[in-house]
């Protein structure tokens, strides 16, 4: 009897395809069991007691392995049930897997899988809550408004947690906490929003906010990037900077504190005295401009036989400058008081303004000899040197008498215009009263680089503790160039305003010097290299940087009287300076919210550095006095103390400003007042009637014979009564004591002394 080996389809030609199906299934079960154990450990869930790799269960699964192929198979193989034979049918393997699934407790594993995400959420929630509580106890919760990502990253590296403002990730903040936990991963936005939701009811201990925002969480004294002060000494506005410039003379100290600032006038209000002071300054500047024009030109270029300007114009200008020198040398309050000019002086001033304008703008000629003009030029130089030594800011003036008009509370070059005509200036400020314009002398002789105007952006940090006010200056800065070459013949903003917000709207002029940067910015190293190439004196930059510090210290000191000294308050300022021809800095303005965006490769490098170093000074230094402060340098420090009462609270004096000559509101009459008024009216009526009867009665009815009225008095009384029919008697008759009985006098006294 021959036996036939039946080879299942699919097994021919490849004996090792299913080499050991039992070991294959066992390996799969081991892998699944290991994954289940790992998942249970992560979710803190106990592993099912029945193990899938139990040898006993596996033996029971495969004890009847030979029978899974069917009875016919065993007969065909000669009754052999050996497992060494690898000739199996596909149905036998499928039945084996089904048998294994049916006999093992897989339903327990399936039912426990939905609880794993919930357990993971609980674990993540507990971890986040622990971090939140720890951050609150260590005062490490912060809120940042705006796109100051450098500040966020710097604080997060220090272990701080962010309390998100409502505008940041608004869509994610509208989701539930469970939905956020499903997608939360380390460092992603979902995790940040989950932590912010948990931290929402805790105060923030570091707040970076805008200037106009309300100060929140004041009770915990957070680090806040805002220092509040009154608007009259808020140097981050034009109006406040003017107020500080008026006060800084009381704090001036050579080498420490001093302010270089173009002279200014507030023409935005109805201050007539300041308007008159500006007109006087404008006329004085016109006189100096004319003398500068004469000094800068040769005498032969200024004269002509057909000239229309006489020497009296030069005499008037010299007289003006002489008067200025006398006032500067012997300055007193009487000299400072502006007196209204006489009619003759008004005519003389107007004549001078017309003729000097013809010379400066139309190149009109003088009708004098060359020798006389040379003498005028010598005197002009003499008096100009005297006044410039007394007033260094006059060295910045030229011969154009230009003034720059700035809105009092605007920034980024908005609303700024340049004018030279007095009428145009006064008309512009009158038409824009709501903008509170500041009129400032334009710097006509600045330091130029390759015939182009520039300014310097310097950073200052102001910090306040419970006992000190610290002024920090940054040792790095950058230059901003105009896109056009400098000229006084064209007054467009693209030439004279170097703000990046203004210059980015214009293209660079094609014939501009090729050595200037295309992005209109230089780093400090590039500027130092330029100074070395141009042969500037040694120490020029040190002189400039020390001037920066002196200006900023003077501004802060002048504003301290109106500054709220709150512990942990700080503020970062962007300060704009120009340089004169001798590398002396001139303060232009101070911005409380400087632009820190990476607009160019220069700002992309320096702005993040400034923010990182700011966090070092504000956050790290109070905890560690030896902590690094980056490039911030302590320029000045002021110690202060607040007088406190017995209860430990600062002493305060609260009051209300008294207003004189104000019509007080009429009070509502009480019942008692109305009753008194009614009684007084009745008394007044009865008294008037009695007086009229006494006046009209003949003298014989009066008991006292000495009280007879003379004929002359009778005539005057009758005349008075006839002209004022049924009116009150004349004052003469009323004041005659003899005709008033005691009852009448009592009634009159009651009438004029009772409360109204």
UniProtKB/Swiss-Prot annotation:
Record has Plastid as a keyword: no
Q: What class does this enzyme belong to in the EC scheme?
A: ligase
One GO CC annotation, please?
microtubule cytoskeleton
Region Disordered, annotated ranges = 104-123, 709-736
Q: Which Pfam families match?
A: TTL
User: Per its database record, what is this protein's job?
Assistant: Essential glycylase which modifies both tubulin and non-tubulin proteins, generating side chains of glycine on the gamma-carboxyl groups of specific glutamate residues of target proteins. Monoglycylates alpha-tubulin by adding a single glycine chain to generate monoglycine side chains, but is not involved in elongation step to generate polyglycine side chains on alpha-tubulin. Has the ability to both mono- and polyglycylate non-tubulin proteins such as up (Troponin T). Required for early steps of spermatogenesis.
For the TTL domain, which residue ranges apply?
272-629
Localization = Cytoplasm, Cytoskeleton; Nucleus
Species in which this protein is naturally found: Drosophila melanogaster
Check the record and name the PROSITE patterns matching this protein: TTL
| Keyword terms of this UniProt record | ATP-binding, Cytoplasm, Cytoskeleton, Differentiation, Ligase, Microtubule, Nucleotide-binding, Nucleus, Spermatogenesis
Q: Name one GO biological process term.
A: sperm individualization
Q: Which InterPro entries match?
A: TTL/TTLL_fam, TTLL_monoglycylase
Q: What is this protein called?
A: Tubulin glycylase 3B
Main subcellular localisation: cytoplasm
EC identifiers of the protein? 6.3.2.-
Species classification: Eukaryota, Metazoa, Ecdysozoa, Arthropoda, Hexapoda
């Amino acid at each position: 009897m021959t036996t036939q080996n039946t080879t299942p389809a699919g097994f021919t030609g490849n004996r090792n395809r299913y080499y050991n199906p039992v070991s294959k299934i066992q390996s799969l079960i081991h892998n699944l069991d290991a994954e289940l154990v790992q998942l249970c450990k992560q979710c803190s869930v106990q592993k099912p007691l029945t193990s899938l790799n139990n040898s006993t269960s596996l033996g029971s699964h495969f004890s009847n392995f030979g029978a899974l192929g069917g009875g016919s198979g065993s007969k065909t193989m000669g009754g052999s049930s050996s497992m060494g034979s690898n000739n199996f049918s596909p149905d036998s393997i499928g039945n084996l897997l089904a048998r294994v699934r049916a006999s093992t407790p897989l339903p327990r594993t399936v039912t426990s899988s939905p609880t794993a995400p919930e357990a993971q959420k609980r674990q993540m929630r507990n971890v986040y809550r622990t971090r939140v509580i720890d951050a609150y106890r260590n005062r490490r919760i912060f809120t940042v408004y705006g796109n100051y990502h450098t500040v966020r990253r710097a604080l997060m590296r220090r272990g701080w947690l962010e309390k998100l403002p409502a505008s940041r990730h608004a869509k994610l903040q509208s989701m539930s906490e469970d939905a956020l936990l499903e997608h939360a991963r380390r460092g992603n936005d979902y995790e940040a929003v989950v932590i912010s939701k948990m931290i929402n009811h805790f105060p923030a201990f570091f707040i970076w906010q805008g200037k106009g925002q309300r100060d929140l969480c004041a009770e915990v004294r957070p680090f806040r990037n805002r220092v509040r002060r009154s608007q009259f000494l808020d140097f981050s506005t034009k109006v406040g900077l003017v107020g500080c410039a008026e006060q800084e003379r009381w704090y001036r100290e050579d080498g420490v504190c001093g302010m270089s600032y173009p002279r200014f006038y507030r023409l935005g209000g109805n201050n007539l005295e300041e308007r008159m002071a500006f007109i006087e300054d404008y006329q004085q500047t016109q006189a100096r401009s004319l003398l500068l024009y004469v000094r800068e030109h040769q005498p032969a270029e200024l004269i002509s036989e057909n000239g229309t300007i006489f020497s009296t114009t030069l005499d008037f200008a010299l007289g003006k400058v002489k008067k200025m020198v006398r006032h500067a040398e012997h300055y007193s309050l009487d000299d400072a008081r502006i007196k209204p000019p006489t009619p003759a002086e008004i005519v003389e001033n107007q004549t001078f303004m017309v003729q000097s304008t013809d010379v400066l703008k139309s190149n009109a000629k003088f009708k004098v000899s060359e020798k006389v003009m040379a003498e005028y030029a010598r005197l002009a130089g003499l008096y100009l040197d005297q006044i410039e030594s007394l007033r260094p800011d006059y060295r910045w003036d030229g011969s154009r008498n230009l003034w720059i008009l700035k809105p009092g509370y605007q920034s980024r070059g908005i609303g700024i215009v340049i004018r030279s005509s007095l009428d145009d200036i006064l008309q512009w400020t009158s038409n824009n009263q709501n903008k509170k314009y500041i009129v400032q002398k334009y710097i006509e002789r600045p330091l130029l680089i390759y015939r182009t105007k520039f300014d310097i952006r310097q950073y200052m940090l102001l910090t306040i503790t419970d006992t000190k006010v610290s002024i920090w200056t940054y040792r790095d800065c950058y230059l901003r160039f105009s896109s056009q070459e400098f000229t006084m013949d064209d007054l467009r903003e693209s030439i004279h305003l170097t703000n990046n917000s203004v210059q980015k709207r214009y293209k660079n002029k094609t014939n501009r010097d090729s050595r200037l940067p295309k992005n209109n910015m230089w780093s400090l190293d590039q500027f130092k290299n330029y100074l070395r190439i141009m042969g500037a004196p040694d120490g020029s930059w040190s002189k400039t940087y020390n001037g920066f510090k002196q200006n900023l210290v003077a501004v802060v000191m002048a504003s301290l009287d109106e500054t709220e000294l709150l512990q942990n308050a700080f503020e970062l300022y962007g300060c704009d300076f120009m340089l004169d021809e001798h590398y002396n800095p001139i303060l232009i303005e101070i911005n409380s919210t400087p632009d820190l965006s990476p607009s160019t490769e220069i700002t992309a490098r320096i702005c993040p550095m400034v923010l990182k170093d700011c966090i070092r000074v504000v956050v790290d230094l109070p905890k560690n006095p030896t902590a690094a402060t980056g490039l911030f340098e302590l320029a000045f420090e002021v110690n202060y103390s607040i007088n406190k009462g017995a209860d430990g609270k600062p002493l305060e004096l609260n009051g209300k400003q008294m207003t004189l000559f104000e019509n007080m509101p009429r009070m509502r009459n009480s019942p008692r007042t109305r009753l008194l008024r009614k009684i007084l009216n009745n008394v007044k009526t009865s008294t008037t009637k009695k007086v009229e009867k006494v006046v009209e009665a003949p003298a014989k009815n009066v008991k006292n014979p000495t009280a007879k009225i003379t004929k002359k008095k009778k005539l005057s009384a009758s005349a008075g009564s006839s002209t004022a029919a049924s009116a009150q008697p004349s004052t003469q008759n009323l004041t005659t004591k003899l005709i008033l009985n005691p009852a009448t006098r009592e009634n009159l006294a009651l009438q004029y002394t009772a409360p109204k």
